[in-house]
């Protein structure tokens, strides 16, 4: 009798995606982050669902409802901190996943890559709106500053900002709509993830060499399911340690003060995972110029397939490109650090140099290095 997992209409889809999926035999732990992102998404949806049962999206009661969750709801504190720190783990996995894609040339799969970039934008939007919901000082002022950036758009900017706010300032209407979008977006992300996987399984996975491996494939289960379970256990261990020992390590102390429109915090900054983009925004002393640098800092990923000048797909055999890639990796924590510092000397000039380096590496130096490596004498 034929196995039910190969004949049942629903089981067949799961089987072809996670059990009998032909997978390259040489993919490393860098390929674990896709499944870890899936786990993070499920965790965020589940914890978010329980938080939404007790949260009220009203400016008068939002802050106290979060306090109520932490103090009065059974295990509410652990659900709240799992959700807050789960977002940090989500972005760590996301950055690792994108970094692996850049290093091994996964962006050659155009459809998969472009859906991935859309997923990144959707996740960033969700995280930003989620940061506004506790209605602390940094929630309120972060929402005010970031949404205000749209006013830099000529002619329609001011109207656009007021339309997003639902009034003349960040208020009840803003909080309500942000809660609505924050609730619905993860489900849209889940749907886009399915499309991402669909396109990936059309072509099959890339591998560290970047060379087609159709003649050397193994089934996904049990080889990579075991590997993914190990990755998942490590992720859960790190998240649990973070939640139980230092739950506020990655948060901002200002967010424990209720939002006050009459009192501006000394230094307004978003969550740590947006600081690299925030540093690029601040490095240009002009509102429109800053916005025009901020958007391409992430949208630049769309250009990666066009920027690929190498004859080889992966950087595995390209020492010059590897050096430049790791300089880029070092540049990002520097931008993140600068984004969290006040706007004063020497942070301004360091931020400007790091921002120039970021764009120079991706747009000029890495494509040039690939061209040079193409023309190196063959031994």
Curated annotation (Swiss-Prot):
CDD domains per record: cytochrome_b_C (cd00290), Cytochrome_b_N (cd00284)
Misc. comment: Heme 1 (or BL or b562) is low-potential and absorbs at about 562 nm, and heme 2 (or BH or b566) is high-potential and absorbs at about 566 nm.
Transmembrane segments: 33-53, 77-98, 113-133, 178-198, 226-246, 288-308, 320-340, 347-367
Protein name: Cytochrome b
UniProt cofactor(s): heme b
Binding site for heme b b566: 97, 196
Primary location class: mitochondrion
Membrane topology per record: Multi-pass membrane protein
Molecular function (Gene Ontology), one example: metal ion binding
Keyword Ion transport in record: no
Record's GO cellular component terms: mitochondrial inner membrane; respiratory chain complex III
Subunit structure of this chain's protein: The cytochrome bc1 complex contains 11 subunits: 3 respiratory subunits (MT-CYB, CYC1 and UQCRFS1), 2 core proteins (UQCRC1 and UQCRC2) and 6 low-molecular weight proteins (UQCRH/QCR6, UQCRB/QCR7, UQCRQ/QCR8, UQCR10/QCR9, UQCR11/QCR10 and a cleavage product of UQCRFS1). This cytochrome bc1 complex then forms a dimer.
Cell location: Mitochondrion inner membrane
Keyword DNA-binding attributed: no
GO biological process: mitochondrial electron transport, ubiquinol to cytochrome c
One Pfam family cited in the UniProt record for this chain: Cytochrome_B
PROSITE patterns: CYTB_CTER, CYTB_NTER
Keyword entries, A-Z: Electron transport, Heme, Iron, Membrane, Metal-binding, Mitochondrion, Mitochondrion inner membrane, Respiratory chain, Transmembrane, Transmembrane helix, Transport, Ubiquinone
Its job: Component of the ubiquinol-cytochrome c reductase complex (complex III or cytochrome b-c1 complex) that is part of the mitochondrial respiratory chain. The b-c1 complex mediates electron transfer from ubiquinol to cytochrome c. Contributes to the generation of a proton gradient across the mitochondrial membrane that is then used for ATP synthesis.
Similarity comment: family membership: Belongs to the cytochrome b family.
Binding site for heme b b562: 83, 182
Source organism, top-level taxon: Eukaryota
């Amino acid at each position: 009798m034929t196995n039910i997992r190969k004949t049942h209409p629903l089981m067949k889809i799961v089987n072809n995606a996670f059990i009998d999926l032909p997978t390259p035999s040489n993919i490393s732990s860098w390929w674990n982050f896709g499944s870890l992102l899936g786990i993070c998404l499920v965790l965020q949806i589940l914890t978010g669902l329980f938080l939404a049962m007790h949260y009220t999206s009203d400016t008068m009661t939002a802050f106290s409802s979060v306090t109520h969750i932490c103090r009065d709801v059974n295990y509410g504190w652990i659900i709240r901190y799992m959700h807050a720190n789960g977002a940090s783990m989500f972005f760590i996995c996301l950055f690792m996943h994108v970094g692996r894609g850049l290093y091994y040339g996964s962006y050659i799969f155009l459809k998969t890559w472009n859906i991935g970039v859309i997923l990144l934008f959707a996740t960033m939007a969700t995280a930003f709106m989620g940061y506004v919901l506790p209605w602390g000082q940094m929630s309120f002022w972060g929402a005010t500053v970031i949404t205000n950036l749209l006013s830099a758009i000529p002619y329609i900017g001011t109207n656009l900002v007021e339309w997003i706010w639902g009034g003349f300032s960040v208020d009840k209407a803003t909080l309500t709509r942000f809660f609505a979008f924050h609730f619905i977006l993860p489900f849209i992300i889940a749907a886009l993830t399915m499309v991402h996987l669909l396109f990936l399984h059309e072509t099959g996975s890339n591998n560290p060499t970047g060379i087609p491996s159709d003649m050397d494939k193994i089934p996904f289960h049990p080889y990579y399911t075991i590997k993914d379970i190990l990755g998942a256990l490590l992720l859960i261990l790190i998240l649990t340690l973070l939640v139980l020992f230092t739950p506020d390590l990655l948060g901002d102390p200002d967010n424990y003060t209720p939002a006050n429109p009459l009192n501006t915090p000394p230094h307004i900054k978003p969550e740590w995972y947006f600081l690299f983009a925030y540093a690029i925004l601040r490095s240009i002393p002009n509102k429109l110029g800053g916005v025009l640098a901020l958007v391409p800092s992430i949208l630049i990923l769309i250009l990666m397939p066009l920027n690929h000048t190498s004859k080889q797909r992966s950087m595995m055999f390209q020492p010059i490109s590897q050096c430049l890639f790791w300089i880029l990796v070092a540049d990002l924590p520097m931008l993140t650090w600068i984004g969290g510092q006040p706007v004063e000397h020497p942070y301004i000039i360091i931020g400007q140099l790091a921002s120039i380096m970021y764009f120079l590496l991706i747009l000029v130096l890495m494509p040039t290095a690939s061209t040079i490596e193409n023309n190196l004498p063959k031994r």
